[in-house]
């Protein structure tokens, strides 16, 4: 009985974490995509500019 309750509680915690993680990234993906694209473009452009100078 104790083992069964432990397994069920563990599975419940894992499922809660998975569903919570899936719900949160959806709105943050929109913000992160806009921020990430601008941040990704800056290092790439600066890296490309440094290579021809060398």
Curated annotation (Swiss-Prot):
Sites of S-palmitoyl cysteine lipid attachment are 2
Arranged from A to Z, the UniProt key words for this protein are: Cell projection, Disease variant, Endoplasmic reticulum, Golgi apparatus, Lipoprotein, Membrane, Palmitate, Phosphoprotein, Retinitis pigmentosa, Sensory transduction, Vision
Q: Which GO terms describe its cellular component?
A: cytoplasm; endoplasmic reticulum; extracellular region; Golgi apparatus; photoreceptor outer segment membrane
Here the disulfide bonds are none
Q: InterPro entries attached here?
A: PRCD
Q: Where found, per UniProt? A: Cell projection, Cilium, Photoreceptor outer segment; Membrane; Endoplasmic reticulum; Golgi apparatus
What mutagenesis or variant effect is reported for residue 2 to Y?
Answer: In RP36; loss of palmitoylation; reduced protein stability; fails to localize to the photoreceptor outer segment
Cite a single GO BP annotation.
visual perception
Q: Which GO terms describe its molecular function?
A: opsin binding
Q: Does the keyword Nucleus apply?
A: no
Does the entry feature the keyword Cell division, yes or no? no
Report the family membership.
Belongs to the PRCD family.
Associated disorder is: Retinitis pigmentosa 36: A retinal dystrophy belonging to the group of pigmentary retinopathies. Retinitis pigmentosa is characterized by retinal pigment deposits visible on fundus examination and primary loss of rod photoreceptor cells followed by secondary loss of cone photoreceptors. Patients typically have night vision blindness and loss of midperipheral visual field. As their condition progresses, they lose their far peripheral visual field and eventually central vision as well.
What does this gene product do?
Involved in vision.
Which PANTHER family does UniProt cross-reference here?
Answer: PHOTORECEPTOR DISK COMPONENT PRCD (PTHR38501:SF1)
What's the protein name?
Answer: Photoreceptor disk component PRCD
Protein's organism:
Homo sapiens
Task: List the lineage, top down.
Answer: Eukaryota, Metazoa, Chordata, Craniata, Vertebrata
């Amino acid at each position: 009985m104790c083992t069964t309750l432990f397994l069920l509680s563990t599975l419940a915690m894992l499922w809660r974490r998975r569903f919570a993680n899936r719900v949160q990234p959806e709105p943050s993906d929109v913000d992160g995509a806009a921020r990430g694209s601008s941040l990704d473009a800056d290092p790439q452009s600066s890296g490309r500019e440094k290579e021809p100078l060398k």
